[in-house]
Amino acid sequence: MAKLGKISDENQKLVDEAIVKTGLNNYMNIRCLSIAKQKPVIKVSRANATTEYVGKLSDTVFLYIKENVFDMLETPQKIMVVQDALSQVSYDIEKDKILITKPEICVGLESYRIYGESIIKTMEAAYMAQQAIDEAEREKKAAERENKKKK
């Protein structure tokens, strides 16, 4: 099992400021833990039912930070990494539910080294094209349902 611990006060303050800026603290508890063995520098995870029950931590999301790597970053880079991780977390007010999504754009490091910023813009264009196709399909299905109701 991975060894978990408390993150440094300096890093906790930085993360807390980022959380407050997002407003997520109004809808859920976000806890930060230091973890020694994980691949990503930062990982977002929802507390499971056992954790919520035993720890009395309802509506809790954990940020697992690989602190030895995180501490090698400059403060602006740390903020960027935390904000990127928090961008995966949202709260659906209508359904009263915490949502954790995967990033819309994933780019391999080798592709980024070769193409630079243009790969990001290309992947964004591809994502937007897919969104347009999905929206057109939803509209088409809605129109078909309306036509069936009219008949």
Name each model-derived stretch.
Residues 47-76, 92:
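Active-site scaffold of zinc-dependent metalloenzymes
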Residues 29-35, 62-64, 80:
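Ordered hydrophobic segments in well-structured contexts
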Residues 40-43, 60-65, 87:
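Subset of Sec-pathway N-terminal targeting signals
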Residues 79-92:
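Active-site recognition of the HExxH zinc-binding catalytic motif
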Residues 92-138:
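Post-HExxH zinc-binding segment in Zn-dependent metallohydrolases
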Residues 136-151:
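Short acidic DE-rich linear segments
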Residues 1-56, 69:
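A metal-dependent hydrolase signature that marks the N-terminal structural subdomain at the beginning
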Residues 27-33, 92-97, 142:
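Short glycine-rich, low-complexity/disordered patches
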